[in-house]
């Protein structure tokens, strides 16, 4: 990723972090105010899209979680494709450290959560909740430190978060998929074949891809696979480079779409998702509520699991010679970044909605516990990580 692109990206992400915090705070205020009933009612209001026999009716909350979040995953897929084809994940040497760190940051938190909920099969469904990292929040916190943090650490965290997102995509596909509809899957496969055909034929206009992508989203939604995965599939078929008869400076389809989506995802979709899902009523919750297995597993997974997994696996990779230390970074810097990866927020909340998205009466109670655990664990990780990096970088580093 070019340096200027990283700088522009981080400027967006510091603003994104502030807006996401604001959205979460507003959600908490709404859920604990006289407007709490209205807050719940608004997001349960059914909305119908379509015409005649082609109608889709869902509560507003599900349009946000299944529809708008598919656009977020489209952006994630574009970032993954760009980095794998020509960025920070394009060679084994470049990808080694963030890949190993991301694996540790997913495995250890999941094991901690599972160890605390092992006796409850329903609670165990949330094992992947603390395995996620919110890239906008994490990079926003890192950017607050300015030149104290070397650019190599910011690149490392960006690559780690992208691999973490890829892991979340695979988790959703394999572990949070309901019963499947063969016909809908067949139609989705036909859409994928059309998208691949467009790519191979050299089509560089975006509208045919996006039009088929909408149909693909409907097919995936009806198939039983989570609809957000349609965004990832669409992203992988968007052409990366310009054609041979275009100049090197010509706009590339993937870049055009990525740059067009980033502000919408940053300033609209993720804040709306946070506002819709972060509201947790604290009324009647005793101080011991955080000690229940689900919230405790999430808090410990995000705060302890992430730092142990990311830092521990990074230490092994560097000491073994598998990967180099990020340029200009020190061990305590890497530890601070490992702490910041415990900010799961939107991604953890999203996986939580999938884990307990059932008609079981227990799901509502677990939903509250998930939000409580995610907000607490993310806050703890973000604050402590920021303080560690600030103290370890009192003198600004040269970038």
Swiss-Prot record:
Signal sequence, renumbered to the chain: none
InterPro entries assigned to the protein according to its UniProt record, in alphabetical order: Na/H_antiporter_dom_sf, NhaA
Membrane-topology descriptor: Multi-pass membrane protein
Pfam families: Na_H_antiport_1 (PF06965)
Location, primary (coarse class): membrane
Catalytic activity: Na(+)(in) + 2 H(+)(out) = Na(+)(out) + 2 H(+)(in)
Domain of life: Bacteria
A single BP term in Gene Ontology: regulation of pH
Molecular function per GO: sodium:proton antiporter activity
Keyword terms: Antiport, Cell inner membrane, Cell membrane, Ion transport, Membrane, Sodium, Sodium transport, Transmembrane, Transmembrane helix, Transport
Keyword Repressor carried by entry: no
Gene3D superfamilies: Na+/H+ antiporter like domain (1.20.1530.10)
Subcellular location: Cell inner membrane
Gene Ontology cellular-component terms listed: plasma membrane
Transmembrane region(s): 12-32, 60-80, 94-114, 126-146, 155-175, 178-198, 206-226, 263-283, 284-304, 336-356, 372-392
Known role: Na(+)/H(+) antiporter that extrudes sodium in exchange for external protons.
Family of the protein in this entry: Belongs to the NhaA Na(+)/H(+) (TC 2.A.33) antiporter family.
Name of this chain's protein: Na(+)/H(+) antiporter NhaA
Source organism (scientific name): Rhodospirillum rubrum (strain ATCC 11170 / ATH 1.1.1 / DSM 467 / LMG 4362 / NCIMB 8255 / S1)
